[in-house]
């Protein structure tokens, strides 16, 4: 600017001052960093986890003995209830029996058949790799980042899954990993998640990627274990952060004791998701609660669930209840109907089918 002024000394003073002010104004505008934009909220469905494909300890195991897939019966039941988001847990060992090998054709067909059936019914699917940051190799469990199981190995399977499902209109998101925890210091969850995001985006630039929190994805302890996830980079800017929460004393979801012995209150659920929701707002990020559930043996749990879901709904955070599926039997958290009769928790779930953007605080 000074060089320009010196070379134009013949310009009258009034014009010089005018130009200087205009230039300074322009300079300020071009050097001010753009404001960080928050997420654009739209109405999102709540739903359920439909379990079965992640069942069993034998890997890969036998279909319909060690594990199964949810059926059309489950899809129709929850679709008719208006719960149109399904989190589908699956095991890495089954969809890709050999590291960096091809996807198993039969297992892939089961997954695709389920996704296709959901698509024809207007039901959205989250593909949830239910592996906790680990995988069994020859019957022995290894953690990602160990000599036996590299970050590149898990990136490979997600690249192949993305190629297979990127054209589906009802994939709500790729759930990178269920509940990573106690990861290696040399290979933290942040580094793994970033590698998976980068790899997926080489083949699919559109589908949402769900990044679970570290430390079992705890919403309650999110700032402690998962604060650094705000620094993940997605060239498509389409990440959703996934937390889990349960209302028993240790937030494990075991519910070993009574409502009173678990020190639960009507506001336990709200109190435990507040740290996660506040983190989302502070960092202008989008979130999702992939697991929450209550027993059917005390109606007070239902009020705790109701209050939490209302809080989530009014803060534009949707979620999926844990759980449903054909093999749950007498599991007290299950919302699979018994003999055609709705479970008690269903009454609460039906009050909270979608988020309400106009109410978002």
Could you describe each region identified by the protein language model?
Residues 63, 67-68, 156-159, 163-173, ...:
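Extracellular glycoside hydrolase catalytic/binding regions
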Residues 67-84, 100-131, 135-173, 189-201:
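An active-site-proximal structural segment forming one wall of the substrate-binding cleft
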């Amino acid at each position: 600017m000074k060089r320009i002024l010196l070379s134009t000394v013949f310009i009258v003073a009034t014009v010089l001052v005018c130009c200087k002010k205009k230039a300074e104004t322009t300079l300020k505008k071009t050097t001010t960093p753009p404001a960080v934009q928050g997420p654009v909220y739209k109405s999102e469905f709540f739903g359920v986890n439909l379990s079965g494909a992640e069942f069993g300890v034998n890997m890969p195991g036998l279909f319909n003995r060690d594990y199964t897939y949810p059926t059309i019966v489950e899809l129709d039941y929850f679709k008719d209830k208006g719960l149109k988001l399904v989190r589908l847990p699956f095991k890495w060992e089954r969809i890709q029996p050999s590291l960096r090998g091809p996807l198993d054709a039969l297992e892939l067909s089961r997954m695709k058949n389920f996704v296709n059936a959901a698509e024809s019914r207007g039901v959205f699917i989250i593909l949830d790799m239910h592996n906790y940051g680990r995988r069994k190799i020859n019957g022995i469990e290894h953690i990602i980042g160990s000599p036996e199981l590299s970050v590149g190995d898990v990136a490979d399977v997600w690249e192949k899954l993305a190629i297979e499902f990127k054209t589906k209109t009802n994939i709500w998101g790729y759930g990178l990993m269920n509940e990573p925890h106690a990861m290696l210091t040399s290979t933290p969850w942040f580094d793994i998640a970033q590698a998976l995001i980068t790899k997926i985006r080489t083949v699919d630039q559109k589908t949402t990627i769900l990044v679970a929190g570290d430390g079992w994805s705890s919403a309650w302890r999110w700032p402690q274990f998962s604060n650094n996830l705000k620094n993940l980079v997605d060239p498509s800017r389409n990440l959703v952060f996934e937390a889990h929460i349960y209302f028993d004393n240790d937030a494990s979801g075991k519910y070993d004791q009574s409502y009173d012995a678990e020190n639960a209150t009507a506001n336990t659920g709200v109190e435990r998701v507040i740290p996660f929701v506040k983190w989302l707002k502070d960092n202008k990020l989008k979130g999702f609660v992939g697991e929450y559930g209550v027993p059917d043996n005390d109606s007070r749990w239902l009020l705790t669930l109701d209050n939490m879901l209302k809080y989530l709904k009014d803060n534009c955070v949707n979620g999926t209840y844990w759980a449903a599926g054909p093999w749950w039997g007498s599991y007290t958290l299950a919302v699979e109907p018994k003999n055609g009769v709705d479970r008690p928790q269903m009454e609460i779930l039906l009050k909270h089918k979608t988020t309400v953007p106009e109410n978002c605080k």
